[in-house]
Swiss-Prot record:
Classification of source organism: Bacteria, Bacillati, Actinomycetota, Actinomycetes, Micrococcales
GO CC list: cytoplasm
One Gene Ontology term of the molecular function aspect: rRNA (cytosine-N4-)-methyltransferase activity
Domain of life: Bacteria
Compartments (UniProt record): Cytoplasm
Gene name of the encoded protein: rsmH
Disordered: annotated span: 295-325
Major localization listed first in the record, in broad terms: cytoplasm
EC numbers, comma separated: 2.1.1.199
Gene Ontology annotations of biological process type: rRNA base methylation
Entry similarity comment: Belongs to the methyltransferase superfamily. RsmH family.
Pfam families, A to Z: Methyltransf_5 (PF01795)
Protein name, UniProt field: Ribosomal RNA small subunit methyltransferase H
Matching Gene3D superfamilies: Putative methyltransferase TM0872, insert domain, Vaccinia Virus protein VP39
Length: 325
């Protein structure tokens, strides 16, 4: 972007579409939008500029991202509140600010541009770096520790479940054998090991490290477990008429998002009940049928949008246990 204050800031994915989906909920005075995955603040800057009456609560587990976003969003003054937390801490973050409910929540899931582009973070299999992969550098678990300490069965499970890797058993076995000779500390070492363990026919189908690196990143940061807690918390934080927008980038995330939104957009009335009681009515109304993908123009302008799956919903009724009800 031409007005970026940092050279490594990239175009936010589907910004205009996210704004369009959030707009009906953010028109009212005093509207609060939670950017649950703040990153470097690209989506937030666009939203705050478009809705001058809105207040932002930005959450991120990465202190580096918070620092960059804080500088980028400084021009919006006291309309911005940034919180260092993982996004399943949304309720606690809002309570700390004295906010009972919000008009919008945005999730832009997965690894951020900042984390991918900074080689020393170890997220990329295309550059040699320490095997770190922590989104929050203050946390303890690293990819190096996972490779050094996890039993073979756990490595196999992680590669299979989080990477959907067909060679999970083979890779886990080779890693355990290799670490007997010395620790695997760098991404280049791991890539070389995986390449040697991959049959040529399979290697031609794609980079052998892609799924393993995804699996390690998800394990280190507990991304799927956090998402499963964060989505219900986000829905519960929405005021009636508030909107939730979620961008996911791989099928494991999208399945969780799809399940949560579909479940809460259906009646919970028991089968055979002659009348649907108010407490059984759907809490959400889906705003998009299925998942929306980036069009060719978006992908050409912003290649990072290629794998995105966008889902959105509107809050239609409050939970029975909503505070203040």
């Amino acid at each position: 972007m031409s007005d970026d204050i940092h050279g490594d800031i990239h175009l936010p994915v589907l910004l205009e579409r996210c704004i369009e989906l959030l707009a009906p909920a953010l028109q009212e005075p005093g509207a609060v939008i939670v950017d649950a995955t703040l990153g470097m603040g690209g989506h937030s800057a666009g939203i705050l500029a478009r809705f001058p009456q809105a207040t932002l609560v930005g959450l991120d587990r990465d202190p580096d991202a918070l620092a960059i976003a804080g500088e980028r969003l400084a021009r919006f003054g006291d309309r911005v509140h940034l919180v260092h937390t993982v996004y399943d801490g949304i309720r606690e973050a809002l309570d700390g600010l004295g906010i009972a409910e919000v008009q919008g929540v945005l999730f832009d899931l997965g690894v951020s541009s900042l984390q991918l582009d900074r080689v020393e973070r170890g997220f990329s299999y295309s550059k040699d770096a320490p095997l770190d992969m922590r989104m929050d550098g203050t946390s303890d678990l690293t990819a190096e520790r996972v490779l050094a300490e996890y039993p073979e069965a756990d490595l196999r499970r992680i590669f299979r479940d989080y990477g959907e890797e067909k060679l999970a058993a083979r890779y886990a076995q080779r890693i355990v054998a290799a670490r007997q000779q010395g620790p695997i500390t760098r991404s280049g070492e791991l890539v070389h090991l995986l390449q040697r363990a991959t049959p040529a026919a399979i290697a031609r189908q794609g980079h052998p490290a892609k799924r393993v690196f995804q699996a390690l990143r998800i394990e280190v940061n507990q991304e799927l477990a956090v998402l499963e807690r964060a989505l219900p918390a986000a829905v519960d934080a929405l005021a009636v008429g508030g909107r939730l927008v979620v961008e996911s980038y791989q099928s494991l995330e999208d399945r969780i998002v799809k399940r949560e939104l579909q479940t809460r957009s259906r009646s919970s009335a028991p089968a055979g009940l002659p009348v649907e009681l108010p407490e059984h009515r759907p809490e959400l109304r889906l705003l998009i049928r299925g998942a929306e993908l980036a069009d060719d123009d978006e992908k050409a302008a912003n290649p990072r949008a290629a794998p995105v799956r966008l889902r959105a919903a509107e809050r239609t009724r409050a939970s029975e246990d909503r505070r203040g009800s």
